[in-house]
């Protein structure tokens, strides 16, 4: 009888987290924010990982340099999150990419863009379609970043 009671208690305890997890489903806004936090962290870590002298590196001549690619990701965050918060569309700006994408400038711009996005993701009135598109755009370019890192002999932060 004692073994049966112990078995029943163990089964009940094991089932408790499962039932609680079903009740605690995240909101769509929270789920999208989770995705943004993940990819933004990887992009920031990548920007900090690559040495400053490699910001001009291009796998081939027909693509952006590493610095230009990271700057484009920051410009994208500024646009997607800015337009998610705005009552009307905002114009795309290549200010970071065209502003001489050195490591100090890119890392600072990326962190600033992430701060701006955190405001948008924290808003209950922000357009979730734009916030989702920001995660998609950032993830797409993080995929590019992985190739650059591997070609430079560096381990991607997500690995």
Regions found by a protein language model. Name each.
Residues 5-16:
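Bacterial N-terminal signal peptides
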Residues 16-29:
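Cleaved targeting-peptide boundary
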Residues 26-33, 100-104:
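Active-site rim elements
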Residues 33-37, 41-44, 54-94, 125-159:
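Short, contiguous alpha-helical
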Residues 42, 46-47, 81, 113-116, ...:
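Well-ordered alpha-helical scaffold segments within catalytic/enzyme domains
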Residues 50-51:
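Membrane-proximal, proline-rich intrinsically disordered regions
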Residues 97-142:
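Acidic/histidine-rich alpha-helical segments that form the ligand environment
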